[in-house]
Design a protein with these regions (language model features):
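C-terminal motif of bacterial Sec signal peptides marking the signal peptidase cleavage site
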Residues: 30-33
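Post-HExxH zinc-binding segment in Zn-dependent metallohydrolases
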Residues: 162-168, 172-219
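C-terminal soluble interaction/assembly domains
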Residues: 340-449
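Bacterial signal peptide processing site
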Residues: 35-37
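Catalytic zinc-binding patch centered on the HExxH motif and its immediate surroundings
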Residues: 80-92, 113-134
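Short pre-active-site segment immediately N-terminal to the catalytic Zn-binding motif
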Residues: 137-152, 182-183
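Active-site recognition of the HExxH zinc-binding catalytic motif
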Residues: 56, 150-167, 191-192
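Pan-zinc metallopeptidase signature
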Residues: 59, 224-352, 358, 366
Length: 449
């Protein structure tokens, strides 16, 4: 989830390069040594920049407007910079709310603390980063030459991107996590794609190299003990900008050769995951105004309690929610496919936290698939849950008794389905026992088409 998109590079890609991309990019490193390029500048990284810049420009189709700056920092200095971002007021508030939502949905253990987990991930992963505020690429001192080359190559792409789009403004977006995830996936995905293209060549990528790289990226987590033992939702959210983002960029270059993806970025995880949502159906590419955009959903104020946070899940995070208790990729994919906009709110009540989640769907079939899978999800999440309402009732109220062995209090869950115009609206209210009824009025939910 992409809670702090700029941290993701430091958290994951460094070690992933070590375990995955070093062997794959060996030809790039060797070729660099055999075919020296003119140095860029006169600093300690002049030769490295001379080798890497042309390859990055060729792989992205963009040229540097100004020469990038590289500086060395100690591991402690890099850690301090990243931890400052992690503990900033905005980041801390966002992380705390996300943690409460994840606990309510059973995506992380009740006693989990995501802040120290991210700190440990930082300590495991730090190699380098690009800071858009200072326009400088920082690398950790005493890094092995092959790791340095790969780190610089990846982060040079971010430096190049920052000369064409405002990375700072992308990172500062709030209130629509799904859109922020889509943007971050393009930034990280283009960097991964550029690395692979620089090392393997475009032909190799198209002839199965990309599929092998995808598998290798996932296998690489075996060498990252902190990462591999993190909750599934954390692992997948950190991986997605790299794997899912690079996968989209790979498809984009095939469907729209010569076009700059930074100037026409997807705005939702659905557009990343579904060719039809972004490119359109068939071989031709639809105009931007003909794409499938998520409908903004606005929730009314709850009848009681206080809204702590409100955001979006989108298709990708909806998949993760379902997958946690129904570990079948096809089932989770079908459940989330067709979501056309959503909004959740975390409501703080005296009895405990409640979650209100409204989602609009393309059609009744896809909404029914989601409701069916979510019903199964409820049974897996709360084995003793039950409902007296008919299976096909538009509103079903579920009661989950307390489970002292697992430290769970009794819960009430309401699943409500209605039609707005031609599209179904699904409203889920998960609250402490007896508090779900009337917490939100579905009739006051606004869908902006």
């Amino acid at each position: 989830v992409t809670l702090f998109p700029r941290l993701v590079a430091a958290l994951h890609i460094a070690r992933a390069r070590r375990a995955l991309l070093v062997p794959m990019l060996g030809t790039f490193v060797l070729a660099s040594a055999c075919d020296p390029a003119p140095a860029v500048g006169d600093g300690p990284y002049a030769k490295l920049l001379g080798r890497a810049i042309p390859k990055v420009e060729e792989a992205t189709g963009l040229t540097f407007k100004t020469t990038p700056v590289i500086a060395t920092r100690s591991r402690d200095e890099v850690r301090e910079f990243l931890l400052k971002q992690l503990t900033s007021e905005r980041a801390a508030t966002q992380l705390a709310a996300q943690e409460r939502v994840y606990k309510l949905l059973g995506l992380v253990p009740k006693d989990a603390d995501l802040n120290p987990l991210l700190r440990r991930l930082l300590e495991e992963q730090i190699v380098g980063y690009y800071d858009p505020a200072t326009k400088t690429l920082y690398v950790v001192e005493d890094v092995k030459p092959e790791i340095l080359e790969l780190t610089v190559t990846h982060e040079l792409v971010h430096a190049l991107q920052d000369q064409y789009v405002n990375i700072d403004s992308i990172q500062a977006q709030v209130g629509d996590a799904d859109r922020q995830l889509a943007a971050q996936a393009i930034l990280e995905g283009q960097a991964v794609y550029a690395q692979l293209r620089a090392s393997m060549g475009e032909t190799s990528l198209r002839m199965g190299g990309w599929q092998r790289a995808r598998v290798a990226m996932r296998d690489a987590q075996e060498g990252m003990p902190v990462f591999s033992n993190a909750p599934m939702v954390v692992r997948e959210s950190l991986l997605f900008p790299y794997v899912g983002g690079a996968d989209f960029v790979f498809r984009f270059t095939q469907r729209r050769p010569g076009v700059d993806v930074l100037q026409d970025m997807p705005v939702s995880s659905r557009q990343l995951l579904s060719d039809a949502a972004y490119f359109g159906r068939g071989d031709s590419v639809v105009a931007p105004d003909a794409r499938d955009y998520p409908a903004p959903v606005t929730l009314p104020a709850p009848s009681k309690g206080r809204v702590v946070a409100s955001n979006t899940f989108g298709e990708f995070e909806t998949r993760l929610i379902v997958f946690e208790y129904i570990p079948n990729e096809l089932a989770a994919g079908r459940a989330a496919q067709g979501v056309d906009g959503d909004r959740w709110a975390l409501v703080e009540l005296p009895q405990g936290d409640a979650l209100v989640w409204a989602s609009v769907w393309d059609n009744a079939v896809e909404a029914a698939e989601f409701v069916d899978q979510f019903t199964e999800w409820l049974r897996k999440r709360h084995p003793r849950i039950g409902s007296r309402d008919a299976i096909d009732a538009p509103t079903r109220t579920w009661y989950a008794p307390a489970d002292s062995a697992k430290g769970r209090a009794a819960r009430s869950v309401i699943v409500h389905v209605e039609t707005r115009g031609t599209r179904p609206l699904v409203v889920i209210t998960d609250a402490p026992y007896g508090q779900a009824a009337g917490l939100i009025d579905p009739a006051r939910i606004v869908i902006d088409d």
